[in-house]
Amino acid sequence: VDWVEKKNLPLSNRDYHSLQWLHYYLLQQGLIDQAASIFAIQQKDMAEGIKTRSNLRAGKYYYRMLAASFIETENWEIIDDFSPPNGWKPKSFSEAGYRFALGFSTAMQGKIEEANKHLLKLKAIRKKDFKKNYYKRIEYLKVWELEIQTAIKLYQNDFAAAIKLAKQ
């Protein structure tokens, strides 16, 4: 990240993939504040990139870092603090990842009706927008749907149904 600034290069030259993994590593180590500062870099770059249309790559990693932020800490409410910036127009896969993040987080908070809304949007994306040329990513969406459904069943104390969903 710093080398881009030192060489006065455009932010689109940043390696957001590595930034995402650094964020995840810090979360795994329990260094929550440091991880938050890394996520803040992505958030800032994403907002600026949308405004100037100069760096739309930063948005690709938004849902990944968002999901890691609450899954690794089990702080399900944190998602409310990280709405995407105005003007974010993700591709189908990133939109699906964002819907998973919202659906899973709300399910874990017991907001079942809201979780089901995100689940329906996720299913609609899978059925409408995905084609065979997305490699195996369609399976990701199916797994995300199952994870949300499992979280709902766990919250409802329907453990038999949750286990059945998890085994699919």
Describe the role of every protein-language-model region.
Residues 144, 159-168:
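Generic long, charged, amphipathic alpha-helical segments
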